[in-house]
Amino acid sequence: VEQYPDNFIAIAKHNYYQETPEALKSPTYDYDLTGTWPYCTVDRIFTFDPVPANSLANVRAALELGTSVALDAVATFVPENPNRVNVSATAQFTAADNEANYRFAFAVVEDGITGYKQNNAYAGNKNGEMGGFESKGSSASVTLNHVARSGYGVKEGIENSIPQSVNEYNPINYSTVLDLPSTVINRDNIKVVAFIINKKKGSIENAVQVNVTEQGETAIADVNATQTPD
């Protein structure tokens, strides 16, 4: 995230071992990886052990691929209902396509979650460097960021959200209302991630992350046709 703050969106799913606290699980974020944990995927193209060297190399590789669609989004709390979020996303394709197979999807993530300890496989520098975890004990207190709280179409995309025929730079708009789960601790720390799934490739074509604001405030993030891995 530090290396590519404008091009990288992190989503952390906590659900890979039996002792995962229920409050950290997100059953609606139903895109799963296979293999041992921790595991990472960038745009659902590159999958790897997220040590720093691997992470940077795979993010750079994803950025070099580019994208065929620009994306922006806006998210606001529903007036008088803080547990619901209005979200609108707009896509613009860089070329016309009469056989487009893309879909919108959304996720809610939360930052600043405390009160948890994490088993630390990097304690004592046993497995190399890992962002300071190599100098911590076998059980380390952590502040969790980018935690997946809920997903909306994240596995297959929302059906019929993008038409089969798209024109060059013609805006395609999609709006919906997201219900926040009870696991959200602080709504001031949540963000909405909008992304476009390329159904032909099974990959993420582009994504954008926005803050959720009160109705009337502005929270728009505009992403051009530069690849944005998640």
Task: Identify the role of each PLM range.
Residues 1:
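Conserved redox-active cysteine motifs that mediate thiol-disulfide chemistry
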Residues 4-5, 228:
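Short, well-ordered coil/turn elements that cap or connect secondary structure elements
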Residues 6-217:
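Short, conserved sequence motifs used for protein processing/export or organelle targeting and
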Residues 212-229:
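Residue-level detector of functionally pivotal "anchor" positions at catalytic/ligand-binding pockets or at interdomain
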